[in-house]
């Protein structure tokens, strides 16, 4: 591949030394333009800086990978097990309107801490951070198991997310430390397979465990795997070369953007609380919603300001956001992250309410689409290895996601199980293609020495999209349901205003309250619930279609570079 230096501002970004070693071992390479539409080929003359000529020369590699891949499996398992079980949990605690926070609270902390683990591991060492992430995740699982109420469970999930944010990140970082560059793609493929396998297991067993035994087992079963990962890692995972433990505490606060992390957590939490309280439309929550909205905006503005002046490794390097191309790819990542999680967490509710599935059956229905995601990732990897253009892969992935979400609008109680299974496949295959191709579309627009920071930036933006996918869609369903029930139930002359408000309150708190209503009213409320879920599905489809439009726009506005390549 021909490469040249360019005067374009996006091509000469100064690397952040605190993070350049995390995901990229070649941070010493001079900043040169990389064609973002093709995959750069590794030259046979490339020198690996790890000191190993073969993966078979790495001491205790098998045991190290056992520890790391167990964490990756747990990350995939936890991501879908709550999707299968959150309706059951909401029922038990009579807080169905807060059930989305079981996932949202986890995503807030994991999203924020995920990029921080890179700096933490540089300063404190890989071992300490690996034990910290796995230990906090394990303790969070135990806290979830013993939670006595929804509020306690939400706090437990937040605590669990602090550790969860490092499970995949540290696995990638440690592999980058020890695996020769030419073999790293193979080990990344192992991670993707374990992540997909974990997601399949979580989707398949989450509903079964919550229905047959208890939803608490969904968290308890993760503890032995986490303990095993910690035990194996204790004996075999070592700190990175060049690490010194004698001065790390004095530079801890200089290298890690702790203030930025706190502002981001506060801002995201406030904005998501606005969605939760705002969906109730009650007088008691109206003023707090305004205050939370103001607080959220102020925290986000302050976060952006801190990122622009911090001397630490920023959570979001603002230099990477310059340029229309970068903005379009990041917005695409945000939208497909939002749509992907919204789709995943809407389906179990739809299956149980509209199709009449039990929690276990609804969970098993998610197994097939969960299997489709790693297949999509495998297809993406094969095509990228054959130099298939990344821009076309991104368009294809988002197109399949849009098609799948559109097909989900036609799922109805009388649909054939085979047809239903076919309808569920495209969205997840598209996600398996779209997620990695959006990452490479972004990072290959920058020089090699900026790939680490651009990777963490894209992951963070997509995770924020996932946050609003779960929290936002829950708010859409609750708000639409309340409005529709109020309009339809007022047509009953036998119901006064107080009775209507009680029905609305009970149904929003517990889905089982719906089946305790008189048959005529039950039919109306069930129809309203279906209507609300359909609105959420339509919103998800629109978001994905917008992302598809941005993919087209990205390919039409990308500037031509001096090397002759196009972004």
Curated annotation (Swiss-Prot):
One record GO biological process: basic amino acid transport
Main localization of the protein described in the UniProt heading: membrane
Pfam families membership: MFS_1 (PF07690)
Top-level division of the source organism's lineage: Eukaryota
Topological category with respect to the lipid bilayer: Multi-pass membrane protein
Alphabetical list of InterPro entries matching this protein: MFS, MFS_dom, MFS_trans_sf
Membrane-traversing stretches: 136-156, 159-179, 193-213, 217-237, 258-278, 291-311, 334-354, 364-384, 393-415, 426-446, 457-477, 536-553
GO MF: basic amino acid transmembrane transporter activity; L-amino acid transmembrane transporter activity
Subcellular location: Membrane
Swiss-Prot/TrEMBL keywords: Membrane, Transmembrane, Transmembrane helix, Transport
Gene Ontology CC entries for this record: fungal-type vacuole membrane
Family label: Belongs to the major facilitator superfamily.
Protein's name in the database: Uncharacterized transporter C460.03
Organism: Schizosaccharomyces pombe (strain 972 / ATCC 24843)
């Amino acid at each position: 591949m021909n490469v040249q230096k360019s005067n374009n501002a996006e091509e000469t970004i100064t690397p952040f030394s605190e993070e350049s070693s995390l995901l990229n071992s070649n941070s010493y390479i001079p900043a040169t333009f990389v064609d973002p539409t093709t995959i750069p080929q590794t030259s046979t003359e490339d020198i690996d800086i790890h000191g190993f000529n073969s993966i078979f020369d790495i001491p205790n590699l098998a045991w190290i990978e056992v520890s790391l891949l167990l964490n990756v499996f747990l990350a995939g398992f936890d991501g879908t097990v709550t999707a299968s079980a959150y309706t059951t949990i909401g029922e038990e605690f009579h807080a169905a309107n807060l059930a989305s926070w079981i996932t949202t609270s986890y995503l807030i902390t994991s999203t924020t801490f995920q990029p921080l683990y890179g700096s933490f591991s540089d300063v404190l060492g890989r071992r300490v951070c690996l034990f910290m992430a796995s230990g906090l995740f394990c303790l969070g699982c135990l806290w979830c198991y013993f939670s006595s109420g929804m509020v306690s469970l939400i706090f437990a999930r937040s605590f669990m997310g602090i550790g969860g944010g490092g499970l995949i990140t540290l696995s990638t970082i440690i592999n980058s430390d020890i695996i020769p560059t030419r073999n790293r793609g193979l080990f990344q493929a192992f991670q993707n397979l374990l992540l997909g396998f974990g997601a399949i297991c979580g989707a398949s067993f989450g509903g079964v465990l919550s229905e047959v035994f208890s939803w608490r087992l969904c968290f308890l079963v993760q503890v032995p795997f986490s303990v095993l990962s910690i035990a194996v890692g204790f004996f075999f995972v070592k700190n990175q070369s060049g690490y010194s433990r004698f001065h790390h505490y004095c530079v801890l606060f200089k290298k890690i953007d702790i203030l930025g992390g706190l502002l981001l957590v506060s801002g995201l939490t406030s904005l998501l609380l606005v969605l939760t309280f705002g969906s109730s439309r009650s007088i008691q929550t109206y003023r707090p919603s305004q205050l939370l909205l103001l607080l959220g905006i102020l925290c986000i503005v302050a976060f952006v300001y801190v990122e622009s002046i911090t001397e630490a490794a920023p959570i979001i390097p603002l230099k990477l956001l310059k340029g229309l191309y970068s903005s379009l790819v990041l917005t695409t990542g945000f939208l497909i992250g939002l749509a992907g999680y919204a789709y995943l967490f809407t389906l179990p509710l739809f299956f149980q309410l509209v199709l009449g599935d039990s929690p276990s059956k609804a969970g098993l229905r998610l197994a097939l689409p969960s299997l489709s995601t790693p297949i999509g990732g495998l297809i993406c990897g094969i095509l990228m290895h054959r130099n298939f253009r990344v821009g076309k892969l991104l368009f294809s992935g988002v197109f399949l996601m849009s098609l799948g979400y559109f097909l989900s609008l036609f799922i109805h109680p009388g649909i054939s199980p085979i047809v239903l299974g076919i309808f569920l496949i495209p969205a997840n295959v598209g996600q398996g293609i779209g997620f990695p191709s959006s990452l490479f579309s972004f990072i290959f627009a920058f020089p090699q020495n900026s790939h680490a920071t651009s990777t963490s930036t894209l992951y963070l933006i997509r995770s924020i999209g996932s946050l609003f996918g779960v929290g936002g869609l829950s708010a859409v369903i609750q708000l639409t349901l309340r409005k529709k029930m109020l309009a339809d139930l007022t047509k009953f002359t036998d119901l006064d205003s107080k009775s209507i408000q009680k029905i609305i309150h009970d149904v929003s708190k517990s889905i089982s309250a719906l089946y305790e209503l008189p048959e005529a009213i039950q039919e109306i409320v069930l129809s309203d619930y279906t209507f609300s879920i359909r609105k959420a599905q339509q919103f998800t489809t629109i978001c994905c279609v917008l992302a598809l439009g941005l993919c087209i726009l990205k390919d039409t506005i990308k500037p031509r570079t001096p090397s002759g390549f196009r972004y």
